[in-house]
Amino acid sequence: MNEFLINLEDKPGAMAECCEVIGEAGINILAGAGIASDSAAVVIVTDDADGTVEALKSIGVTYTMRPLETAVLHHSPGSLGVFTRSLAENGINLQSIFIMKTDGDEVHIGYSTA
């Protein structure tokens, strides 16, 4: 599984264009987050990395594709803190993290590291 860090213009419709072209290619977006300050960016996870590459190329946006690791944590207070602390103690720098789904007592996460 991969994540895509997409650099966008900070203007109305920039994210919509990316989501539309990915959807029109029949690709499902599984998770995502966006943020804007001086510039705008969105990070998404899809069910088809190759198709996502082609879709993003077709609209000329700048992106970076990174491998996404996954883990299943207990869905309780503090479990994410324990997980991220273990990464830090092993010298692993966290680049991104997603809540992929919750299922009863479990939370499935996706994350990338440097």
Predicted regions mapped to residue ranges:
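A conserved regulatory-domain signal marking ACT and ACT-like small-molecule sensing domains
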Residues: M1-A114
